[in-house]
Structures are given as structure tokens and as C-alpha cells.
Amino acid sequence: ANWKLVLENNRECYHCNASHPELLKTLLEWDDVTDPRADQAFKDHVAASAAAWDAEKIPYAHASFGLRNRIVRMPLLKGTVSMTLDGKQGCAKLMGRIKNPDLGSMRILHLPHSWNHCMGDHIIVFTVWPISAQETVVTTKWLVHKDAVEGVDYDVERMRKVWDATNDQDRRLAE
């Protein structure tokens, strides 16, 4: 698809509610309490999550580095801990020193080409690169704990379902 359409589709989220049912089983549609769509329930959920993260000394404050780089941690939907179809852990081994799987999604954005979701159990890395005016390569990688064993600690297909569906939906929208 046209690279400008691919990038625009991936940076605006107004299409998500109508286009990404799998993704919105766990991911909140926005990542800012000042978003005009943010209702009081969302703001309360963010505040409760921030209090829990403070207790565990988990950083979450928005940080911007120029216009293209941003880091923010946002909660997932209540009752979910990972971007899987059922919202449960996709990998039994948690990342790094993490002991609590309910850490939301730490988003690391290097716009316009890369955005990442870091959860307690795995990390999703996206890159988008234009090849020509009408062709774009979108790459998605899933990272798990270095000691996690496929088939024992995680199921690749189960962990990929949400973003495989979302990427395919976005491809159809942009083409």
C-alpha cells in the first residue's frame, strides 16, 4: 500500500473502534487522559494503575524527546494483562526483573517508523519502511524472556493472533 496511508493509519486511532475488534479486547483506544474521548472511568483506571506502579517503582510518566520520540506506560483494559485474545499472559515467564504481569503497555515510539508495546510477559516491535510510493514493508516481532521455551512457556500462534489480525485489517484499510 501507499506508504503515507500505511503510516497515517498506524498513527491515528480513530479507526480502531470500527476496525480492530481483536485489538480492543485488551488495548485502550487512546493513551492520554487529556484525549477528548477519555471519560472519567478511563481517568480513574489510569490513576489506579499509576498508584500500583508507584508502589512497585515502575516508571510510567509520559516522556517526549523532540517531536518524534515518546515513551509512555498505559494500562490495558481492566482484567487484562497482555495483548492476547483473552487478555491473559501470552508467556509464562515474565520479562526482566518484573514480578507482576499487570503492567499495562509501555509504549516506545520513534515516529514515524517504529512503535513498540512492552508488557510484563512479552514485547511487540513494529517497524514500517516505504520501499516505493505504493509499497511498504511492515515488520512485527514478538520478544519473550530469553529463557522462555516455545511450547512450554508460550504458544506462538496464541501470542500472535491479535496483532496478526490487526496488521491484516490495517493492510486492507490502506490498500
Model-predicted segments: where are they?
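C-terminal catalytic domain of Rieske-type non-heme iron oxygenases
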Residues: 1-175
